[in-house]
Amino acid sequence: MEKPDLYVVARFLDIMFSNGPSMKKTNIQMLLGVNYPRFMEYLEWLLKRDLVAASLDEEGTERIKLTPKGIESYHRLVDWIKETLDGVKI
């Protein structure tokens, strides 16, 4: 994916920031509202840029969490969208 939709990236980061320290991929995908192949493209894009990280929990389930860089990006991108596009829901 060369040019992701920044609104989808913002929604992804917002979901991660708002729903706890880590989440299962399926839960993120359902909240994001995109099909699974498209979700995986965004996840891979975010992983390559160190905005999110994958790890296994104690049960061996893969979980995704925001990195410090992802938290910073969340604040910059999502806050900018909320300020600039007054009334737009992320």
Residue positions per predicted region:
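Short alpha-helical segments that sit at the start of domains
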Residues: 1-13
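Short amphipathic alpha-helical interaction segments
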Residues: 2-3, 33-48
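Short, locally clustered residues in the helix-turn-helix/winged-helix DNA-binding domain
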Residues: 13-20, 78
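Short acidic, hydrophobic short linear motifs in intrinsically disordered regions
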Residues: 21-31
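A short, conserved structural fragment
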Residues: 47-57
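Basic, amphipathic "hinge/linker" alpha-helix immediately C-terminal to the N-terminal HTH DNA-binding motif
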Residues: 60-77
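Amphipathic alpha-helical dimerization/coiled-coil segments
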Residues: 76-90
